[in-house]
A protein has these predicted regions:
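Alpha-helical transmembrane segments and their membrane-interface boundaries
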Residues: 1-14
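Membrane-embedded helical hairpins/re-entrant loop segments and their flanking transmembrane helices
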Residues: 16-47
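A structural signal for short secondary-structure junctions
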Residues: 48-49, 89
């Protein structure tokens, strides 16, 4: 449990699968009214790491979007591990933080007290957006 909580400080931006980036893509880049409405519906929940509107409204009905969700679940932990253990860019959190619904810049600051950890969170957000973007040619 402790190991899982150590890496969650930057991993699940917007919920499992880092779907905050997909929510913002739906909100700002979608060509269809359905995906844009889903982005409007899901942005409030995604800011508090609740991604069920996006998972069930977007990913479940478009199985092609399961691929980037799986890729983010594989790539982002590797990125966080490299930036915390090998490069030592951001500190490893020293405590368990179970308020998963706390928005990520706030929870990252509370658990690490480090600007570098917030930068790592933003790096993970950009990587997740780059993973979702080619798959989400939102019609």
């Amino acid at each position: 449990m402790l190991i899982i909580n150590l890496f969650l400080f930057s991993l699940n931006l917007g919920g499992v699968g880092a779907t905050l980036s997909l929510t913002l893509l739906c909100l700002f880049k979608a060509k269809s009214d359905q995906y844009r409405a889903l982005g409007k519906l899901g942005i409030g929940a995604s800011l508090f790491n609740i991604n069920e509107p996006i998972v069930y409204g977007c990913i479940a009905w478009n199985p092609l979007l399961m691929i980037p969700m799986w890729l983010t679940a594989i790539i982002l932990p590797c990125v966080i591990w490299v930036f915390t253990k090998i490069i030592a860019f951001a500190p490893i959190p020293a405590m368990v933080f179970n308020l998963w619904y706390c928005p990520y810049p706030v929870s990252t600051w509370l658990i690490t007290r480090s600007i570098n950890a917030i930068l790592l969170m933003l790096i993970c957000f950009v990587i997740a957006a780059m993973i979702y973007y080619p798959f989400s040619s939102l019609r």
